[in-house]
């Protein structure tokens, strides 16, 4: 390394921990990453090129927005009997009545203040580079105007609004601002009679009938899924990522090979994220609510919420800007991307507290983003409280000091390995810092009086 730039700030914690919601406490990683031997590298050069571009972005946002946003409850899961061990329903309604109430939220979702321009401005200000928007979660409710179901925002109280096809307008606004574009789609659809057929009870997340006994039902569901994905891939502009959730539906083939073959004719190089289904259609992996212990030698992102939930809930405890920066820096040093979960309110805006916190993250990145964006991993990527990244040609090494929340910045920091061979500078201000080499260790004296932590920590 010819140069070593010292990035001082409130970044990665030495031991990563985060407040756990009920789901995390029960399951830990909701979608655990697999072994490197399970990853199948794409053979399509256009997909490989798109993956390389995506890996440069480092920081994305995942929007969950749907029926669950109206009462401010966990998304979809409360209508699934399998998940009673970690989610509780509000009130004392029997299951059938509760499900009827939940479906009926379609008549209450009326986002009169829907403002995708505000969403995009907040995320751009935060330094976010790619986006994933939930077009349909497991409950089957569509945020796009589908011809194949009436269970969508375009058929509720918002139907006469010129922006009733909210997915179209979200994608359109973000695309014009230069974000890489991702379309979230749930493979299971609990509202569709060809998935959860009303003739049978619904014991778990999967189809509630035997396909061998009802092959026509499953064929109808395959066709329904194909038709909806065709809509999204042909009527909603260009996409970089098709992000498919519901990987626990294993063995239920929706003809994804055919879907992707057709979609890539419309979107060359489209990245397929068939979550938790190891193989050729999972072009990058998505560990959820946690960070891998070590570097991984294949593409991946950690999906982590800004609050404790993916969708909007009232009075949510949000992570501090410092914690978000810590998480992003650790993930970057380990070779991944951070997909940050944000839930807009039921009336269609990003709430003020989210805006404030993400603004501080973005302010930090405006000075220190060189250590995050377009970087690559280094063989020695951590020592104590310091994380390392490098530029693509390997000529500049970035050292990111990990200041734990609540602690004061020390006057001197040190690390072993990755010793500087030339000047060391702060990214903010490009000023040199003093350092001393002592054997295999470097000691860096920090300049006094520099404000390097984000506000609101």
Language model regions located:
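Mature catalytic domains of secreted/periplasmic carbohydrate-active enzymes
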Residues: 23-457
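Bacterial Sec-dependent N-terminal signal peptides
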Residues: 1-25
């Amino acid at each position: 390394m010819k140069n070593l730039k010292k990035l001082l700030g409130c970044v990665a914690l030495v031991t990563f921990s985060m407040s756990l919601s009920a789901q995390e406490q029960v399951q830990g990683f909701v979608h655990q990453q697999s072994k490197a031997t399970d990853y199948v590298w794409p053979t399509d050069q256009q997909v490989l090129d798109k993956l390389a571009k995506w890996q440069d972005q480092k920081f994305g946002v995942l929007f969950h927005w749907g029926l669950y946003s109206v009462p401010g409850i966990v998304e979809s899961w409360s209508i699934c009997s399998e998940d009673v061990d970690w989610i509780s329903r509000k009130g004392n309604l029997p299951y059938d009545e509760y499900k009827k109430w939940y479906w009926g939220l379609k008549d209450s979702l009326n986002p009169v203040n829907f403002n995708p321009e505000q969403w995009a401005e907040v995320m751009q200000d935060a330094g976010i580079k790619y986006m994933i928007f939930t077009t349909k979660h497991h409950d089957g409710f569509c945020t796009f105007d589908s011809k194949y179901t009436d269970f969508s925002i375009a058929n509720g109280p918002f139907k006469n609004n010129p922006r009733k096809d909210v997915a179209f307008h979200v994608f359109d606004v973000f695309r014009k601002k230069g974000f890489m574009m991702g379309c979230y789609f749930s493979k299971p659809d609990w509202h569709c009679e060809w998935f959860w057929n009303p003739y049978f009870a619904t014991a778990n997340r999967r189809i509630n009938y035997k396909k061998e006994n009802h092959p026509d039902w499953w064929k109808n569901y395959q066709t329904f899924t194909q038709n909806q994905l065709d809509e999204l891939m042909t009527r909603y502009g260009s996409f970089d990522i098709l992000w498919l959730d519901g990987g626990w539906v294993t063995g239920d083939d929706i003809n994804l090979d055919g879907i992707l073959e057709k979609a890539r004719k419309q979107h060359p190089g489209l990245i397929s994220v068939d979550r938790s289904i190891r193989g050729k259609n999972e072009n990058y992996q998505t560990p959820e609510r946690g960070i891998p212990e070590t570097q991984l030698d294949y593409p991946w992102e950690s999906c982590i919420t800004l609050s404790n939930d993916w969708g909007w809930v009232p009075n949510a405890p949000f992570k501090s800007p410092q914690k978000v920066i810590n998480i992003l820096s650790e993930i970057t040093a380990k070779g991944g991307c951070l997909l940050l979960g944000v839930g807009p309110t039921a009336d269609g805006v990003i709430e003020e507290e989210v805006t404030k916190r993400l603004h501080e993250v973005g302010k930090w990145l405006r000075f220190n983003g060189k250590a995050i964006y377009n970087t690559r991993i280094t063989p020695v990527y951590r020592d104590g409280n310091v994380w390392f990244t490098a530029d693509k040609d390997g000529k500049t090494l970035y050292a990111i000091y990990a200041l734990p929340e609540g602690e004061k910045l020390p006057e001197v920091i040190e690390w072993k390995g990755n010793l500087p061979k030339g000047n060391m500078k702060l990214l903010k201000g490009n000023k040199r810092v003093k350092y001393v080499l002592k054997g295999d260790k470097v000691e860096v004296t920090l300049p006094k009086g520099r404000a390097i932590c984000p506000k609101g920590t």
